[in-house]
């Protein structure tokens, strides 16, 4: 009986020794997966001065004051950084951010804008001479429209434009063509909202800010051909109205800050020539176009545009 007991104790001890390393190893693996993102998942994992670049650093919420921004500003910055995250291989963060964009702009419009922005980036862009100062003022005017606590508005207008962590992220991603372009666009808009015009101009170089202008035009159907019509039809009404006001503010601010050449036209009634400020002509043309977009997207066109959007942008 004593011998049998010794045998059983030996078997138990052996099982303990064999099973404990397995449990310890499995627990160790679970911990490492939850705290450290493997390089294969990061895509472009590069070293900054003191620590590796992580996907979390590319999220909009890593930018101070982003939480207090109005919906249109959040949508524009988030859309650009969403594409930067995708180009960097951060799939989990892409999906989480995309769900937030869906709530702001609508599913179909967001998908169409993601695709449209990718096409703009691939095809290149021309120098449209977009005024960063005017865009910055327009974004701030739109921000001050939003209801909310005054402390939030003060956070948005904070003029402290130096952020060492964000600058270190920029120094790395700026070397990566696709990631850098989207990141520069997102942060150019972000700094414009914060009234950091010099920083916004720096990030908007090489046409990055032009992408933002083209994106705004597509959101009101003023560019992009059929794609623009699809986007403006699918965009949530509140978001579309906000973008329309932003564009109107932009042209108003540009007219004030930029000397405009005059256009000479002949008046048959008087037989004399009349001069008109070209800025006024552009503003009237844009206002008329926006009105046409709103009035011509009738109910019977909606199913056709919706089907076109699904076919054109389903990925």
Curated annotation (Swiss-Prot):
Tissue expr: Liver.
Superkingdom as given in the UniProt entry: Eukaryota
Keyword Transport: yes
Keyword Zinc: no
UniProt family annotation: Belongs to the apolipoprotein F family.
Annotated function: Minor apolipoprotein that associates with LDL. Inhibits cholesteryl ester transfer protein (CETP) activity and appears to be an important regulator of cholesterol transport. Also associates to a lesser degree with VLDL, Apo-AI and Apo-AII.
Name by which UniProt lists this protein: Apolipoprotein F
Taxonomic source organism: Mus musculus
Gene: Apof
């Amino acid at each position: 009986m004593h011998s049998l007991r010794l045998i059983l104790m030996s078997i138990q001890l052996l099982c303990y020794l064999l099973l404990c390393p397995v449990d310890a190893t499995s627990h160790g693996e679970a911990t490492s997966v939850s705290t450290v993102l493997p390089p294969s998942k990061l895509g472009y994992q590069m070293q900054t001065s003191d620590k590796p670049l992580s996907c979390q650093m590319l999220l909009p919420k890593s930018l101070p004051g982003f939480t207090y921004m109005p919906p249109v500003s959040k949508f524009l910055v988030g859309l650009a950084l969403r594409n930067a995250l995708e180009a960097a291989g951060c799939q989990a963060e892409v999906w989480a951010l995309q769900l937030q964009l869906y709530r702001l702009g609508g599913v179909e419009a967001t998908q169409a804008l993601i695709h449209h922005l990718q096409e703009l980036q691939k095809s290149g862009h021309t120098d449209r001479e977009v005024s960063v100062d005017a865009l910055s003022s327009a974004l701030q005017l739109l921000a001050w429209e939003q209801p909310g606590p005054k402390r939030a508005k003060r956070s948005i207008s904070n003029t402290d434009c130096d952020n060492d962590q964000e600058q270190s992220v920029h120094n790395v991603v700026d070397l990566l063509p696709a990631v850098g372009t989207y990141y520069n666009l997102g942060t150019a808009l972000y700094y414009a909202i914060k009234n950091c015009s010099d920083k916004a101009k720096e990030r908007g170089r090489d046409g990055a800010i032009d992408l933002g202008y083209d994106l705004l035009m597509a959101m009101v159907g003023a560019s992009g051909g059929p794609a623009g019509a699809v986007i403006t039809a699918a965009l949530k009404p509140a978001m579309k109205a906000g973008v329309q006001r932003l564009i109107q503010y932009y042209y108003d601010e540009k007219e004030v800050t930029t000397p405009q050449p005059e256009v000479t036209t002949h008046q048959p009634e008087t037989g004399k020539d009349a001069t008109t400020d070209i800025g006024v002509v552009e503003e009237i043309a844009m206002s008329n176009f926006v009105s046409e977009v709103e009035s011509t997207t009738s109910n019977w066109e909606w199913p056709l545009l919706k089907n076109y959007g699904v076919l054109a942008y389903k990925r």
